[in-house]
Regions:
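Transmembrane helical elements of multi-pass membrane transporters/channels
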Residues: 19-38, 140, 174, 203-207, ...
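Short alpha-helical transmembrane segments in multi-pass integral membrane proteins
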Residues: 1-21, 79-146, 188-243, 299-364, ...
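Transmembrane alpha-helix boundary and packing residues in multipass membrane permease domains
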Residues: 24, 28, 40, 77, ...
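Small-residue-rich hydrophobic transmembrane alpha-helices
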Residues: 51-111, 148-167, 273-331, 335-337, ...
Length: 450
């Protein structure tokens, strides 16, 4: 059974949603800081080539990480659904099956990232001066991919159980270890991009050990047995939810990798500036991202308990919270982007290029507040095929073509390339509004017939 704090089917929606969201936001802030520290330390104590390598290599790592997170969303939603339905005895098989599936995924990613690190770097159009360092960064992160996958799986399990505080502790451990590692390996031993990658993998490994220990000590409302660790029927259920999300996220991240490649064609300073801007973008997207993740568990529990109206109300509450914060972030990014960029680099050209991208990207901080809450609602409502569909439309028909078009213009600029993101997101909002109206009408028709 869920305790009162983890029971989202009753009580004030705003208070419950914010209380559940805040630890997720805290974890995402630490994760963003975790990634930013690599760029910050390399930018201060490494080379410009090393900065470009971390920028480009982290785009590859982000692709893998975000796809894994969306894959794991299937586990989060299914666990929350079983809690809402008061059937916790099924959760052990979900966790055991998830461990097997994600281990298989780790092996495949290990082979791809370690064996093809250099071709990946070339495909990303890393500047010639930074290809070797980029390949080294990707290869080292690939060698430790098991820990990165395991961390995200464990976090998904805890969130499905209504516990958003434990993942915050996991990432806190990782962040502290990563900072120490960067200072020792990059600032102290001058290992440049390779040192940043080693620090990242070491930090993730220690956080996984901590997470496993915490899960074993947790008072769970179900049992996990050896027979659960196999490809069982629950695998098909969480894959049905997670696969569409993972595919959609994969193609979305591919579009951002392509965007990175478009920018790399503009030169080393543009590449480094874009990398700095992306770290700021990561921070700007934290509240919408935390709302989306918390919304999935919140909605899934209420759908499982038969409280569809409450599930819809939670979506609108999330949009309101996101817009309130988004207005503040929009002003900071649009008018103080150069100050934000100067935190990560002292190079005037890098700062100028980073700020140029942020000017075009700025409206994204507002429209994403709406889109992500809607996507979180549909994820929790098991409409992940739709989430995939609308995501693919945004990526393949809007964001990628528009960014490419902007990049090949004679007067190409990072500001114009940055506009591709908010334009695509706006299209996504209209698509989701239409689908929401369609579902409501279908639900009303079904109610009348019954």
């Amino acid at each position: 059974m869920t305790n009162d704090k983890a029971d989202f089917t009753q009580g004030n929606i705003l208070k419950k949603l914010v209380a559940f969201m805040m630890p997720i936001l805290g974890a995402l802030i630490l994760q963003a800081a975790y990634g930013a520290v690599d760029l910050l330390v390399v930018g201060r104590f490494g080379s410009t080539s090393g900065l470009s390598a971390v920028s480009t290599g982290s785009q590859v790592l982000n692709l893998v990480t975000f796809v894994v997170i969306q894959f794991a969303m299937g586990i989060t939603v299914l666990i929350a659904r079983y809690l809402g339905e008061k059937r916790p005895e099924r959760i052990g098989a979900v966790i055991g099956g998830g461990a097997v599936v994600f281990t298989m995924m780790s092996v495949a990613l290990f082979i791809a990232m370690v064996g093809f690190a250099r071709p990946i770097s070339v495909l990303m159009q890393a500047p010639a001066e930074a290809v070797d360092l980029t390949a080294s960064y990707v290869r080292i992160c690939g060698a430790g991919i098991f820990f990165i996958v395991a961390y995200n799986l464990l976090s998904a399990i805890f969130r499905g159980l209504g516990d958003s505080k434990s993942p915050l502790l996991f990432v806190l451990v990782a962040c502290i270890v990563n900072i120490i590692g960067d200072l020792v390996l990059v600032a102290g031993l001058h290992m440049d991009a390779a040192g940043a990658a080693i620090a990242t993998v070491t930090a993730q490994a220690l956080s996984v050990v901590f997470a496993v220990m915490l899960l074993l000590k947790k008072d769970l409302p179900f049992a996990i047995t050896k027979k659960d660790f196999r490809l069982n029927p629950q695998c098909r259920k969480f894959l049905k939810i997670g696969l569409p999300l993972a595919l959609q996220e994969f193609l979305t991240q591919i579009s951002f990798l392509a965007l990175c490649a478009f920018v790399n064609r503009l030169g080393l300073e543009a590449s480094s500036g874009y990398g700095v801007a992306c770290k700021i973008v990561n921070f700007a997207m934290l509240v919408p991202s935390s709302l989306m993740q918390s919304m999935a568990s919140f909605v899934s529990q209420n759908i499982g308990a038969g409280k569809k109206k409450r599930a819809k109300q939670s979506m609108f509450t999330g949009i309101g919270v996101g817009l309130a914060v988004g207005c503040v972030v929009f002003v900071l990014v649009l008018f103080k982007g150069d100050v934000l960029c100067s935190v990560f680099s002292t190079d005037a050209a890098v700062i100028q290029n980073g700020f140029a991208y942020l000017k075009g990207f700025a409206p994204e901080t507002l429209v994403t507040a709406i889109l992500f809450s809607m996507v979180g609602y549909f994820n929790g409502n098991n409409k992940t095929v739709w989430v995939m569909t609308q995501g693919l439309i945004q990526t393949l028909l809007v964001r990628l073509p528009l960014a490419y078009f902007m990049s090949i213009q004679p007067n190409a600029s990072l500001t114009k390339i940055g506009l591709a993101a908010p334009v695509a997101t706006t299209v996504g909002i209209f698509l989701n509004i239409g689908f929401f109206i369609y579902l409501n009408r279908a639900e009303q028709s079904k109610s009348i017939l019954s």
